[in-house]
Amino acid sequence: MGGHIRLHQDGHRIFHHSGIAAFAEYAVMSVHSLVKIDPTIPPEHAALLGCAVMTGAGAVINTSEVTVGDTVAVVGAGGVGLSAMMAAVAAGSTKIIAIDISDEKLEITRKFGATHAFNATDPDIVSKVKAQTDGGVHIAIESAGVPKALELAFDVTRIGGKTVAAGLPSPSRNVSISHFVLGAQERSLKGSYMGSCIPSRDIPKFLTMYQQGILRIDHLAGDQIKLEDLNEAFDLMKKGGALRTVLVP
């Protein structure tokens, strides 16, 4: 392949996301994709910074700029959403609403800082969230990657509230929100790609918070599997039965 293509199969180039994807024992990486970390940090915990923690915590700290006393809703209780909840606690939020379609996932959200939990399929969920938050949350983080989740996140914010889209759906998916409410109630809607993070700046910061016991990244670590069992991990993820599965040598 001339030595200039990093990933290939049978002579064909393999395209991948963010320049870092590599399910392999060894990989050649761009220097721009590397961040030096404290060697005392367990690699199975540091690995979680690559997406889940950086995306979720970054959406709270960088994109939405949660401050002390803000009420926060997180729609989607996967790895990104749980990371957002931990970051909301660290930022000083005293009321954190967890929303998901899975009661099983909602049960574990309190371990990550949620003070209230609601099933997204509840037809009265918007009124229930607003009743708990004096008219709606200050900030809602969508971390499910589906349009309905973003619409719900927008609906549970208060007048002047901010909705942050951290999930990534298919490029063809669209959302429907009230143009009138967006303008008349001075709400805002903002995107957050990878937590608006600069890895060289934010990964060390988040790892310091982990070492201080502020971001319990270790709570996100699920099963550890071998590389040859990778497909089983994907199957588990599709079923919604995994937090963050870690590949180990």
What are these model-predicted stretches?
Residues 1-34:
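Glycine-rich phosphate/adenylate-binding loop and adjacent beta-alpha elements
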Residues 32-33, 38-123, 127:
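Mid-domain Rossmann-like dinucleotide-binding core that forms the NAD(H)/NADP(H) cofactor-binding site
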Residues 66, 133, 144, 155-158:
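A generic alpha-to-beta junction signature in SAM-dependent methyltransferases
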Residues 85, 106, 150-154, 179:
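Generic hydrophobic/aromatic pocket-lining and core-packing "Φ" positions
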Residues 102, 169, 195:
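Residues in the short beta-alpha loop(s) of Rossmann-like NAD(P)-binding domains
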Residues 123, 147, 151-155, 200-249:
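C-terminal hydrophobic helical "lid"/dimerization subdomain
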Residues 124, 128-140:
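A short acidic, Gly/Pro-enriched loop at the edge of an enzyme's catalytic core
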Residues 161-164, 176-219, 243:
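Rossmann-fold dehydrogenase core element
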